[in-house]
Design a protein with these regions (language model features):
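Phosphate-handling DNA/RNA-contact segment within nucleic-acid enzymes
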Residues: 1-23, 29, 56
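Short alpha-helix boundary/capping motifs
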Residues: 24-25, 78
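Alpha-helix N-cap/helix-start capping motif
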Residues: 28-29, 50
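TOPRIM fold recognition
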Residues: 34-38, 43, 47-134
Length: 134
C-alpha cells in the first residue's frame, strides 16, 4: 500500500513522540479525544479553560519551555494560534507548529477533531488505489 501523503503520518508520529515530553495545546475536550484516538499519549492541555489567553500563556510559560500548538484551522483557531504565538514567544517559550502548518497548508479541514477522519481517509484512498477493499 502506497500512501498518497506519507508525510502526514510521519509528522503525526513525530508530534506524538515529542508529546511524550512536550505538551500540546488544543482548544477543547473534543480535540483531546481526537488526538488520543490517533495515538497521542502525552500531556494535552485545553486552551479554553475560562481564563484570558494572556493569563493562560503566562501559566503555560511558567511551567513549560517548549510546547506544540495545535489549534483548529478555522478563522477562530488561527486567531488563537497567532495570539498565543505572540504571547508565548514573549515569555521565551519555544513553539512547535510543524504538524499544524503541514495540515493547514495541505488539507481543507476545519478542526483538530477532523484529524482522525483525515488520516482514515488518506489510508482508505491508499488501500482503494491498490484495488483492495476494506
Amino acid at each position: 500500500m502506497e500512501l498518497k501523503d506519507p508525510e502526514l503520518f510521519t509528522l503525526k508520529d513525530r508530534a506524538a513522540e515529542m508529546n511524550l515530553n512536550v505538551p500540546i495545546l488544543v482548544e477543547g475536550k473534543h480535540d483531546v479525544d481526537a488526538l488520543r484516538e490517533i495515538g497521542f499519549r502525552g500531556h494535552l492541555i485545553k486552551i479554553n479553560r475560562g481564563v484570558s489567553l494572556d493569563l493562560f500563556a503566562e501559566m503555560i510559560a511558567r511551567n513549560f519551555r517548549k510546547i506544540i500548538l495545535l489549534t483548529d484551522f478555522d478563522r477562530k483557531g488561527q486567531s488563537i494560534k497567532t495570539r498565543l504565538q505572540v504571547l508565548l514567544s514573549s515569555y521565551g517559550c519555544e513553539i512547535n507548529l510543524e504538524f499544524w502548518d503541514f495540515i493547514n497548508r495541505n488539507y481543507k479541514i476545519k478542526s483538530v477533531e477532523d484529524i482522525p477522519w483525515l488520516m482514515e481517509k488518506v489510508l482508505s484512498e491508499a488501500t482503494n488505489s491498490n484495488g483492495k477493499r476494506h
